[in-house]
Amino acid sequence: ASDVYKRQVKLRSNEESEINGQGPVITEDNIKKLYEKLDCLKESDVLVLAGSIPDVMPSSMYMDIMKHLEGRGINIVVDATRNLLTNVLAYKPFLIKPNNHELGEIFGVEITDKDDVIKYAKKLQEQGARNVLVSMAGDGAVLVTENGQEFKAKAPKGKLKNSVGAGDSMVAGFVYGYLKSNDYK
């Protein structure tokens, strides 16, 4: 079924708003079919777990998926907030992608510069993340790799039209670049 039960409107600024509706009803059979598809993944495949979990699903869903796939050599990317992100660290995700505000929320601090991002990204690595990519809106991004490399990138010049999907695009670009070159640069 695709019934919508609630809507949430977020006014982010004078230029942008966000409207979220609750997703469809998800049954145990739907979850079983998801796991059947996940079982088709092979070593070195990339799985991206992104966004929030519908209320009708267990809040441990990302963690459950990672536990289910553990030891199979699948590169799992997690782009989520707070507990959805921190709960998966024990399963050593290939990449996590918080933004600087989400990173600060995890540690109860305000993060405003790239040096702070690096400091707290390394703390997430100590908890299990292999690579940490942190987006910083107009201030660019930081990548801290499992090899100890630190990359700082500036945001592209230009006029922002709409930031919706920017983080998702960053994850997609990283995954594409990594798969193409097998390098973090």
Task: Describe these PLM feature segments.
Residues 10-43:
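Conserved phosphate-binding/catalytic loop of the ribokinase/pfkB sugar-kinase fold
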Residues 10-12, 20, 49-50, 79, ...:
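Short beta-strand segments
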Residues 15-22, 94-105, 119, 123:
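A polyampholytic, Gly/Pro-enriched intrinsically disordered region
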Residues 46-116:
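Conserved beta-alpha-beta core of the PfkB/ribokinase-like small-molecule kinase fold
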